[in-house]
Curated annotation (Swiss-Prot):
It is found in: Host membrane. Keywords: Host membrane, Membrane, Transmembrane, Transmembrane helix. The chain crosses the membrane at residues 452-472. The keyword Ribonucleoprotein does not apply. The gene is A10. This is Uncharacterized gene A10 protein. The keyword Transmembrane applies. Its main location: host cell. GO terms for cellular component: host cell membrane; membrane. Residues 1-104, 116-280, 317-407 are annotated as: Disordered. Residues 116-130, 204-217, 232-242 have a biased composition (Basic and acidic residues). Coiled coil: none annotated. Residues 364-379 have a biased composition (Polar residues).
Length: 472
C-alpha cells in the first residue's frame, strides 16, 4: 500500500538546534529525533542533545514570528507554521504507516559549511539574511518490511553506532528511529513504550528482538571453544549495527537463517513482490537478453534495438523515375575522328565539327584500333600537343540540317566523336600541366639540396674558425 500525503505549503527553513536536540521548545511531535521524552524538554544537552541559542545568526530569529509551531513559546524560538509535517492517515495498527527514514530531511544540526561560515566575522554579518529553505523529500510513503522486533530494516541500519551519529542523536541527517513527526511506534512488552537510547550517539538502542545470551554454569558466559560456540546462528536483530547480507524484502521477514521459508505477510497486506519469490533451493532464472548477436548473424534483416540508423538493411536498389532509358552502344574509328572524312558508312558528307584537339601528331600511347569501343577510346589515347597549332581554325558549329534527328545513330556518332576529341584535348592539357609541375618540383628539390650543402659547409667552416681561435 502507498500513502501519499499532502506536502506543506512551503519548504520550511532550517530549524534551530534547540528544537532538534531536545532543547527549549522542541515538541516531540515536531522533532522526535532527539532521543528524549516529553518530560525531558527544556533540558537541552542533558539527555536529548545540546541546544543552541534560539536567536542564532545563522538560522535566523524566529522568536518574533507571529505564528508559532504547536508547543513552542515566543521565548523558545518557534519555527513557525511550516514545521509540522502533514497529518498521517489513520491506520488500524499502532505502528506508523511511514517508516522513520521516510520523513523529509529536516536539518536539525548545522552543517559543516555553516560552522565554517560562523568562524568568519564577515560571513557572520552576511548570514543575517533570510536562510535558504531546505528542500523536502517527496511525500510518498511506501510500506517497508518489519523485523521480528518491530523495527524496520532501514531503522536497523540508521540508528546503530556505525551510522555516523551526530551530537543531536540519530543518524548523520539528524533522524531518529521514531521518525520526524510520526506517531509513536508500536508498544513494547506489557504495553510500555520501548526504552530509548541514552546519551545521543553513544549507546545503540536496546533491541527487543535479540535472543537472550546463553549462560554457562553458575551464570557465567559459556566457554569460547565449547560446543555452544560452534557456528551459533546469527540473528540480525541482535546486532543492529550490522547490515543484513541481503535486502529482506517487503513484509515480515524471518531473521533465523536456519529456516528458509518466508513468513507470510500480514492479512490484508498485499505484497507485490510475493509472486517474485521463488521456492527455497531454486536458482533464479537467467535473464533473457533483448538482442543476441549470434541470433542476428543467423537471422536475416534483424538489427539491434539501439541501432537507429537502419542503414545496414536499407534497400539499395536505384529507383528510376519515368520510363527506363534504353542504352545505345556505338563504336567509332579513326576515320570518324578525322575531320577531313565524313561519317562512317558512306553517308553524305557533313560539315566537320570544330576540333579542339591541337595537332594530333604528338599523341602518346597506342593508336586506337578500328571499331574501337568507347571505353577503350577514352582510356587508350592521351595525346600531348607541343604546339597548339589547331586553335587558329576554330569555327562556329554549323547549323544542323532541317532533317537532323538528335536521336539518330548518325547524330549520336557525331556527338560521341566530339566528346572523345574533347576528352583527348583535356588529357593532353593535363599531361602538359603535370610535366610542368614535375619540372618545377625537381628544380625546387635541387635548389633545396644545394642550400643544405651550403649550410653544412658553412657550419663546418664556422666550427673550424672557432677551433682555430681557441688554439691560437
Amino acid at each position: 500500500m502507498v500513502y501519499i500525503t499532502r506536502p506543506p505549503d512551503r519548504d520550511p527553513p532550517n530549524p534551530p538546534d534547540g528544537a532538534a536536540g531536545g532543547g527549549p521548545g522542541a515538541p516531540e511531535e515536531v522533532y522526535a529525533n532527539s532521543g528524549g521524552t516529553p518530560d525531558e524538554k527544556g533540558e537541552g544537552g542533558v539527555k536529548g542533545g545540546g541546544g543552541d541559542d534560539p536567536q542564532d545568526p545563522l538560522l535566523g530569529d524566529y522568536s518574533n514570528s507571529p505564528e508559532k509551531a504547536p508547543g513552542s513559546t515566543p521565548a523558545s524560538g518557534g519555527l513557525g507554521p511550516y514545521v509540522l509535517p502533514p497529518p498521517l492517515p489513520d491506520s488500524d495498527d499502532d505502528e506508523s504507516p511511514c517508516p522513520s527514514w521516510y520523513w523529509p530531511l529536516m536539518l536539525s544540526q548545522k552543517t559543516e559549511y555553516d560552522k565554517l561560515d560562523r568562524s568568519n566575522e564577515f560571513e557572520k554579518d552576511q548570514d543575517r539574511r533570510p536562510q535558504r529553505p531546505t528542500t523536502l523529500a517527496l511525500p510518498v510513503c511506501l510500506t517497508t518490511e518489519v523485523l521480528v522486533d518491530g523495527r524496520t530494516w532501514h531503522d536497523q541500519n540508521l540508528d546503530g553506532p556505525d551510522s555516523m551519529s551526530t551530537p543531536g542523536g540519530g543518524g548523520a541527517s539528524g533522524r531518529s528511529p521514531n521518525g520526524l513527526g510520526a506517531r509513536p511506534k508500536d508498544k513494547g512488552p506489557k504495553g510500555k513504550s520501548p526504552p530509548k537510547c541514552g546519551p545521543a550517539g553513544k549507546t545503540p538502542p536496546k533491541d527487543l528482538g535479540a535472543r537472550p545470551k546463553e549462560k554457562g554454569p553458575k551464570g557465567k558466559s559459556p566457554p569460547k571453544d565449547g560446543p555452544a560456540a560452534k557456528n551459533p546462528p546469527k540473528d540480525p536483530g541482535a546486532r543492529p549495527e550490522k547490515v543484513p547480507l541481503a535486502f529482506p524484502g517487503p513484509g515480515p521477514v524471518d531473521t533465523n537463517p536456519s529456516r528458509h521459508d518466508v513468513i507470510e505477510a500480514a492479512p490484508g497486506d498485499e505484497n507485490p513482490y510475493k509472486k517474485m519469490w521463488l521456492p527455497p533451493g531454486t536458482k533464479p532464472p537467467c535473464p533473457t537478453p533483448l538482442w543476441d548477436p549470434c541470433a542476428v548473424l543467423l537471422s536475416s534483416g534483424s538489427t539491434p534495438p539501439w541501432d537507429r540508423r537502419k542503414g545496414i538493411h536499407r534497400n539499395t536498389k536505384v529507383k528510376t523515375i519515368g520510363t527506363p532509358v534504353t542504352p545505345v552502344y556505338l563504336t567509332i574509328s579513326d576515320d570518324d575522328l578525322d575531320d577531313r572524312k565524313g561519317a562512317a558508312g558512306g553517308g553524305p558528307k557533313k560539315p566537320p565539327l570544330p576540333s579542339r584537339d591541337p595537332a594530333g601528331s604528338g599523341q602518346r600511347g597506342p593508336t586506337p584500333q578500328s571499331k574501337e569501343s568507347t571505353s577503350s577510346g577514352l582510356s587508350g589515347a592521351t595525346p600531348r600537343s607541343k604546339a597548339p597549332a589547331g586553335r587558329g581554325r576554330q569555327e562556329p558549329p554549323p547549323l544542323p540540317p532541317r532533317d537532323y534527328d538528335p536521336a539518330s545513330p548518325e547524330a549520336l556518332r557525331l556527338e560521341l566523336r566530339d566528346i572523345v576529341q574533347k576528352v583527348r584535348y583535356i588529357g593532353g592539357a593535363y599531361n602538359e600541366l603535370e610535366a610542368i609541375f614535375r619540372d618545377n618540383y625537381e628544380r625546387q628539390r635541387e635548389r633545396e639540396r644545394r642550400m643544405d650543402y651550403a649550410l653544412i659547409a658553412l657550419i663546418i667552416l664556422l666550427i673550424i674558425i672557432v677551433l682555430l681561435l681557441i688554439v691560437l
